[in-house]
Regions:
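A subset of solvent-exposed loop/turn segments in beta-rich extracellular surface proteins, enriched
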Residues: 92-116
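Intrinsic-disorder/low-complexity, polar/charged segments
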Residues: 43, 50-57, 109-115, 125, ...
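Extracellular glycan-targeting catalytic surfaces
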Residues: 59, 118-121
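Active-site loop segments of alpha/beta catalytic cores
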Residues: 1-38, 44-48, 71-81, 89, ...
Length: 350
C-alpha cells in the first residue's frame, strides 16, 4: 500500500508545479479512470430538464468515490465538482441537452446570427440556478472533508462555439462569416467566465487555494481548464486567428488556466506556448498510445510552461517520461480502473 500523502504535502508539490520550482520528483498521482457517471441524471433518454438532475444521487456518488480513492491518489487532490459529466455552460447558452445511453449531448442552438444576443450569462437562468443548488449542497455536504470545485468548463468557450453553432456550419462560418465567429467566441468566453466566477463566489477556498477540474488538481488561486477539440479541423493559421484570442481572453480572467489537448491537437502546441497568459498545458494520451514519440514535444513545453499528462498510461511509459524529461513543472496522473490498480501504480513511483 502506498504512503498516504497529506494535503499539506500535496499543496507544496502543487505550488512547485505551478512555479516550475526545483523539486525532488514530479507530481505523481492516480485518479479514477471511468468517464463521468450519469447516475444523477434521472431521465434515461431524450431531452433533459433541470429538475431531471438528482442532487442527492450526486452527493452519494461523490462520497463513494472519495471513500474508495482518497488513500490511493498520491499527489492528486480529490475534488467534488457539481455533476461534472453535465455540460452546464452549453445548457446555459440555450443548447438542448440530450441523453443517449450514458452520453449527454448539446444540440445546436444558434441557427441564425440574429439570435447571437441571447447568448449571455443570466444568474436567473434555470440551468445556472440548478448548478448553484448542486454546488451549495456539495459545500454543505463536504463540510471541509474535501474541496468543492467550480472550474470545470467541460468543453470551454472554444469548443462551445462548435456545439452552439454546429460543427458543419461553424466550419463554413470560419470563411464566410469570420467576424460573427469572433463575436460568438467573445460571448462564449463571457458566459463561461461569469458563470465560473459566480460559482467560485459560493465555494470556500481550500488550504489557501482552489481545487477543481476533472484533473483532481489544485492551484494557489482561481483556475479553469479549457479545451480546444475543435482545432482538429483547423490549420495553424485558423487556430491563431480564432482560437488563440479566446484562450488569451479566458486566461486574462483567471490566474491559472490549463489547456487540455489530445494527440490530434498537438500541432497547436507551438502557438499555445507563445500565449503568455496560458499557465500550463495538459495532454491526455489516447488509449493504448505510445507516448515515447511525444517526449521531444513535451520537453519543448517544459522549457516554457508546466505540463500535466493525465490519462491511461503504463508504469513503463510513465517511467520513460520521467527518465527523459526535466522534473521541474512536470506532473503525471495515471487513470486507473480500481483503487487496487492505483495502489500498484503509486507503489512503482512513490
Amino acid at each position: 500500500m502506498p504512503r498516504v500523502i497529506s494535503d499539506q504535502e500535496k499543496i507544496a508539490r502543487f505550488r512547485a508545479f505551478w512555479a516550475r520550482s526545483e523539486t525532488d520528483r514530479p507530481l505523481i498521482g492516480a485518479t479514477i479512470a471511468t468517464f463521468p457517471s450519469v447516475r444523477a441524471v434521472r431521465r434515461e433518454a431524450g431531452l433533459v430538464a433541470p429538475d431531471d438532475l438528482d442532487i442527492q444521487e450526486n452527493l452519494k456518488e461523490l462520497d463513494e468515490e472519495w471513500q474508495a480513492w482518497r488513500e490511493v491518489m498520491g499527489d492528486a487532490m480529490f475534488v467534488a465538482n457539481p455533476l461534472w459529466a453535465f455540460p452546464w455552460h452549453l445548457a446555459m447558452a440555450g443548447c438542448p441537452i440530450k441523453r443517449d445511453a450514458d452520453n449527454l449531448w448539446g444540440l445546436p442552438a444558434l441557427d441564425d446570427w440574429g439570435q447571437l444576443g441571447r447568448l449571455r450569462f443570466d444568474p436567473d437562468n434555470p440551468w445556472f440556478r440548478r448548478q448553484f443548488e448542486f454546488t451549495h449542497a456539495l459545500v454543505r455536504h463536504a463540510a471541509g472533508r474535501y474541496p468543492v470545485g467550480a472550474g470545470q468548463l467541460m468543453l470551454g468557450p472554444v469548443d462551445m462555439m462548435m456545439q452552439v453553432r454546429g460543427q458543419e456550419r461553424l466550419a463554413l462560418d470560419l470563411y464566410d462569416s469570420p467576424e460573427m465567429v469572433r463575436a460568438l467566441g467573445q460571448r462564449c468566453v463571457n458566459l463561461c467566465a461569469a458563470a465560473v466566477h459566480a460559482i467560485y463566489a459560493a465555494v470556500p477556498t481550500h488550504l489557501g487555494g482552489r481545487a477543481g477540474t476533472i484533473r483532481y488538481f489544485w492551484a494557489p488561486g482561481e483556475f479553469v481548464e479549457t479545451a480546444e477539440d475543435i482545432s482538429f479541423m483547423m490549420s495553424p493559421a485558423l487556430h491563431r486567428q480564432f482560437v488563440v484570442p479566446i484562450h488569451r481572453e479566458l486566461s486574462q480572467r483567471f490566474p491559472y488556466t490549463l489547456v487540455h489537448l489530445h494527440s490530434a491537437q498537438l500541432h497547436t502546441v507551438p502557438t499555445l506556448l507563445d500565449v503568455e497568459e496560458i499557465t500550463a498545458i495538459q495532454i491526455t494520451p489516447d488509449f493504448g498510445e505510445d507516448l515515447a514519440p511525444k517526449i521531444p514535444l513535451m520537453a519543448q513545453i517544459l522549457e516554457r510552461k508546466p505540463l500535466l499528462v493525465h490519462g491511461v498510461m503504463t508504469v513503463a511509459s510513465g517511467s520513460e517520461i520521467i527518465r527523459n524529461l526535466p522534473i521541474r513543472g512536470l506532473a503525471l496522473l495515471f487513470r486507473c480502473d480500481s483503487p487496487a490498480e492505483a495502489a500498484k501504480v503509486l507503489d512503482s513511483f512513490l
